[in-house]
């Protein structure tokens, strides 16, 4: 099963806000939803999905294992808890949200526990998030590249993460981009605005289309119906070589997500 190119993110959305966002998105035609244990919204996402009436087999649900649940005795029980909250027997994709700080739990231990969850049918696919090249090497050594469906990383026009992307691609690991719009900062960029005007599109559509054109999956979030609908249209926008070169030139290694005590030594 391939990871959908386009999905809904739910980071920082909770309770009624996330329920409304997910229900609206599903109504508009979204079929992939990304959540995580630490977002504290899995139960709300599960409720929204249940109330939407969309059949489970049409959906692609992703969750992520938090660092406190990485040890082999905690990972599977924590995932079962997530499934209960999400009101489903399985998720389509489970990611390791962040590598274990200070290597408290080895990559080998948590990747093998995650692979066991896959063997038990709790998750269809497994993957990683916020992994550097040395960490990807360890993950591959633990479970094989064939078992790593994606590396979900911060990736925007300002942080194009080429080194990690190229290494992942060379080893057959798909990339999912989060923070694709750089917290909305990239929406104000003059270069993006120019490309948007040229295509009669919005800046958000241009950035999402650029990322998908590079082969990445995207998971933008919004609480507004018009933005959710507008973002969907990015799938129909195709940028030309001139546009792509202009966006490539915006890369300035501007990383926005690097929590102290959690972030690895970035490549």
Swiss-Prot record:
<keyword id="KW-0521">NADP</keyword>
<dbReference type="InterPro" id="IPR018170">
    <property type="entry name" value="Aldo/ket_reductase_CS"/>
</dbReference>
<dbReference type="GO" id="GO:0005737">
    <property type="term" value="C:cytoplasm"/>
</dbReference>
<comment type="similarity">
    <text>Belongs to the aldo/keto reductase family.</text>
</comment>
<feature type="binding site">
    <location>
        <position position="97"/>
    </location>
    <ligand>
        <name>substrate</name>
    </ligand>
</feature>
<feature type="active site" description="Proton donor">
    <location>
        <position position="39"/>
    </location>
</feature>
<dbReference type="GO" id="GO:1990002">
    <property type="term" value="F:methylglyoxal reductase (NADPH) (acetol producing) activity"/>
</dbReference>
<dbReference type="Pfam" id="PF00248">
    <property type="entry name" value="Aldo_ket_red"/>
</dbReference>
<keyword id="KW-0560">Oxidoreductase</keyword>
<dbReference type="GO" id="GO:0004033">
    <property type="term" value="F:aldo-keto reductase (NADPH) activity"/>
</dbReference>
<keyword id="KW-0963">Cytoplasm</keyword>
<dbReference type="InterPro" id="IPR023210">
    <property type="entry name" value="NADP_OxRdtase_dom"/>
</dbReference>
<dbReference type="InterPro" id="IPR036812">
    <property type="entry name" value="NADP_OxRdtase_dom_sf"/>
</dbReference>
<comment type="subunit">
    <text>Monomer.</text>
</comment>
<dbReference type="GO" id="GO:0019853">
    <property type="term" value="P:L-ascorbic acid biosynthetic process"/>
</dbReference>
<protein>
    <recommendedName>
        <fullName>Methylglyoxal reductase DkgB</fullName>
        <ecNumber>1.1.1.-</ecNumber>
    </recommendedName>
</protein>
<dbReference type="GO" id="GO:0051596">
    <property type="term" value="P:methylglyoxal catabolic process"/>
</dbReference>
<dbReference type="InterPro" id="IPR020471">
    <property type="entry name" value="AKR"/>
</dbReference>
<comment type="function">
    <text>Aldo-keto reductase that significantly contributes to cellular methylglyoxal detoxification by catalyzing the NADPH-dependent conversion of methylglyoxal to acetol.</text>
</comment>
<feature type="binding site">
    <location>
        <begin position="179"/>
        <end position="231"/>
    </location>
    <ligand>
        <name>NADP(+)</name>
    </ligand>
</feature>
């Amino acid at each position: 099963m391939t990871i959908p190119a386009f999905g809904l993110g739910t980071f920082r959305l909770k309770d009624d806000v996330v329920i409304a966002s997910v229900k609206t998105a599903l109504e508009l035609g979204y079929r992939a939803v990304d959540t995580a244990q630490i977002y504290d919204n899995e139960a709300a996402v599960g409720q929204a999905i249940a109330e939407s009436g969309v059949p489970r087999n049409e959906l692609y649900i992703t969750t992520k294992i938090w660092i406190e649940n990485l040890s082999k005795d905690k990972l599977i029980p924590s995932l079962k808890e997530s499934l209960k909250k999400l009101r489903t027997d399985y998720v389509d994709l489970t990611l390791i949200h962040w590598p274990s700080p200070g290597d408290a739990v080895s990559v080998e231990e948590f990747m093998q526990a995650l692979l066991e969850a896959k063997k038990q049918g709790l998750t269809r696919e497994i993957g990683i998030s916020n992994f550097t090249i040395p960490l990807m090497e360890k993950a591959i050594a633990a479970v094989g590249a064939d078992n790593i469906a994606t590396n979900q990383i911060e990736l925007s026009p300002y942080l194009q993460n080429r080194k990690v992307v190229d290494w992942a691609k060379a080893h057959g690991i798909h990339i999912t981009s989060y923070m694709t719009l750089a917290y909305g900062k990239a929406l104000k960029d003059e270069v993006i605005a120019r490309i948007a005007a040229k295509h009669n599109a919005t800046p958000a559509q241009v950035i999402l289309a650029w990322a998908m054109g590079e082969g990445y999956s995207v998971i933008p979030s919004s609480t507004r119906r018009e933005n959710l609908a507008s973002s969907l249209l990015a799938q129909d926008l195709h940028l030309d070589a001139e546009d792509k070169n202009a966006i490539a030139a915006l890369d300035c290694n501007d990383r926005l997500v690097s929590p102290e005590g959690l972030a690895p030594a970035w490549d």
